[in-house]
C-alpha cells in the first residue's frame, strides 16, 4: 500500500512547465500529426505548396470540418492580418493552442467527474505526469482532439449515471435534456474526427440507453443533437471539398454530398486496404500498446475497486472494441490515459512505495525519447534550408512535412518519379529504401540546384564521404526504425552532393 506524501501543487505546477517545454520541442512522432492537420490546412488557407494525403483528395475519407474548427481560426487570423510568421512559428502556436485546450478541458473534466478531493488529485496528478499528456497530447494528432471530445462526453454520461443511481428524488427528477443534446453533438463530432470514436462509448453508453428508456422524450434530444450536428458537418465538408454545385443540381442525391466518415468506414472495412497501413495481431492493443502507455502504472490499474466506475468501463470498452480492428497503433489509445489514471488504486496491500518512483523514471525517459529525440531533426532541418532552392533527398526519416518550408513552389516525389525542376524546392522521399537505390537516385538527378542528402548521421556510413560536403546537422535526432547498436550515434545530417 502506498500513502502519497507530496506537495501536489508544486508537482502540478512543474508538470505545466514541462508540458510547455515539450510542446515547443521538435520531435516527430508519426506522419499523421502533420499530414492530417496543417499539411492540409496551410495549403487551403495560406496557399502553401504541400503534399496532400489521399484521405483528403477524391472521395475523401477524412473530414475537414474538425480541422477547420480547431486550427482554422488561427490560420485565418494569420492570413487576415498578414502576419509575417514562419511555418515553424505557426506550428509552435498551433501546438500551444492544443496544449492549453488539453490542459483546461482535461483538468476540468477530471475534477467534476470524480467524487472526492483525493480522487481528483490522484487522477490529475498522474495524468499530468504521464508522457502521453506531456508529449503525445501536445502534437497535432486527431487522437489529441479525440481525447478532449471523449472526456467531455464521458463527463456528461457519468452525470446521467449519477442522476439514475441517486437516492435523492429531487436529483432523479432533474431535467437532463440539454445533457443528452450535447452528448449527441459530441458523438457526431467524435465520429467526424475519428470513425472509431464510438468504440470508447459502447460500454458506458449503457447508462445513456437506460436513461432514454425511462425518459423517451429525452431520447429525442439525443437524436436531434446527433443528426443536426451530422447534417452541419456534412454540409461544411461538401462546401470545403467543392461539391456544393452538385448539391444544388441534385439536392436529393446522396452521392452529391461528402460523407467522409462513411467513406472512411468503407475503405477500412476492406482488409487489403488496412494491410497497406500495417496489420497487427489482435492482442497488440492489450499486450503491447496499453502497457507502453501506462508503463508501471499498469500495476496500479489492476484492481477490483474501480471496475464499476464509468472511467474504467470506458477504458475497457476502448481496449476491447478497438482490438477487433487488425490495424492497431499506440496513439489510437491515448484518449484512455486520463480515464485509466482515474482508476489507479494505491490501497492494494502488495503495492510498495518504491513502485511510485518507477512511474517517474518511466515517464521522464519516455518524455525525453518521444518528446525531444524521436525523429527530432526533421522539422529543424526543413526550417534551416527552406530559403534555398534545392533538391533534398531524404533517407531513413519520416516523410518530411513540406508545409514547414512555407513555400508555394515545392514538390514531393518518391523513388523512380520524375522531378519537376521548375519548383523552388524538390523533396525526394526515399523512406527506408536500400542504400544502393538512393545512391542511384543521387547519380541520376539532373539539376542546376544544389542537391542535399539528408539522413541520420549513423546511416551516412553507407555513402562515399568523398562525394559529399557536410553542411549542417541537428544533434537531437534518433531514428528508432533503423537502430544500429554498433553505431547508435544520434543526429540528422545534411550533406551536399559534390
Swiss-Prot record:
UniProt EC number: 2.4.1.-
Pfam families linked: Glyco_transf_22 (PF03901)
Primary site of residence: endoplasmic reticulum
Transmembrane segments: 11-31, 63-83, 96-116, 140-160, 189-209, 222-242, 247-267, 282-302, 310-330, 332-348, 350-370
Keyword Endoplasmic reticulum among UniProt keywords: yes
Top-level enzyme category: transferase
Keywords associated with the record: Endoplasmic reticulum, Glycoprotein, Glycosyltransferase, GPI-anchor biosynthesis, Membrane, Transferase, Transmembrane, Transmembrane helix
Role played: Alpha-1,2-mannosyltransferase involved in glycosylphosphatidylinositol-anchor biosynthesis. Transfers a fourth mannose to trimannosyl-GPIs during GPI precursor assembly. The presence of a fourth mannose in GPI is essential in fungi.
GO biological process, one term: fungal-type cell wall biogenesis
Full protein name: GPI mannosyltransferase 4
GO cellular component terms, A-Z: endoplasmic reticulum membrane
Pathway of action: Glycolipid biosynthesis; glycosylphosphatidylinositol-anchor biosynthesis
Family of the protein in this entry: Belongs to the glycosyltransferase 22 family. PIGZ subfamily.
Subcellular location: Endoplasmic reticulum membrane
Organism of this sequence: Candida albicans (strain SC5314 / ATCC MYA-2876) (Yeast)
Membrane topology (UniProt): Multi-pass membrane protein
Misc. remarks from the entry: May be used as a target for the development of some new fungicide, due the fact the presence of a fourth mannose in GPI-anchor proteins is essential for viability in fungi but not in mammals.
Glycan attachment points: 47, 84, 408, 473
PANTHER family: GLYCOSYLTRANSFERASE, GPI MANNOSYLTRANSFERASE 4
Alphabetized GO MF terms: alpha-1,2-mannosyltransferase activity
Source organism phylogeny: Eukaryota, Fungi, Dikarya, Ascomycota, Saccharomycotina
